[in-house]
A protein has these predicted regions:
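Glycine-rich flexible loops
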Residues: 1-188
Length: 188
């Protein structure tokens, strides 16, 4: 994929995250790996305003090559790439997944579609956002899974490409919402 097209797709996907309610203006981020280069959403740019030229370009060692400053969650993205064969990551602070993460529970989708798409979504113990501790915890906990809940924080989803990671992120949020909905029915 050409670099400019890839950056455009990243900007467009940041807009999707906002429009679909998976992020607020300044929360959430995503990245795509191409060989040893990572294209990652910028810090301090509202998700609905990210443009292709804003996308940050970094090495797998974290050296900044181009674009705006990378997301503060860059260490976590790089750590995930080092332990998985994923080429894309979506990190979102969506309402239901974040609420479930605050309850301290893994996510098992209650519906057939969610079970097939997601499998089990583990809970990664709390670590302060943007830190090497979070990067280490996530890279240790996500191996073998399509995503994870980050305790008191949100979700992270991985995929072979950006669309795949986005679909997993949206699937995690939908599964978390179903868990919430079912809890309302079980109280009757």
């Amino acid at each position: 994929m050409r670099v400019q097209l890839l950056k455009h797709e990243i900007a467009k996907c940041m807009g999707w995250l906002f429009k679909r309610g998976l992020t607020s203006a300044l929360s959430g981020n995503l990245s795509v790996r191409v060989d040893d280069v990572v294209y990652i959403s910028p810090t301090k740019v509202p998700s609905y305003r990210v443009r292709a030229e804003d996308v940050s370009v970094v090495t797998m060692k974290g050296d900044h090559l181009a674009g705006r400053s990378p997301s503060s969650e860059m260490p976590t993205h790089l750590a995930i790439y080092k332990v998985t064969d994923s080429n894309a990551i979506v990190h979102a602070h969506s309402r239901f997944a974040t609420a479930l993460s605050c309850l301290g529970a893994d996510l098992q989708s209650p519906d057939v579609e969610g079970k097939q798409l997601l499998g089990r979504i583990p809970l990664i113990p709390y670590a302060r956002p943007g830190t090497s501790e979070l990067a280490e915890a996530v890279s240790n906990g996500i191996k073998g899974f399509r995503g994870a809940l980050l305790e008191n924080h949100g979700l992270v989803a991985v995929g072979a490409d950006l669309e795949g990671a986005y679909i997993v992120a949206e699937g995690i949020e939908r599964a978390a919402q179903l868990v919430f909905d079912l809890s309302l029915f079980s109280r009757r």
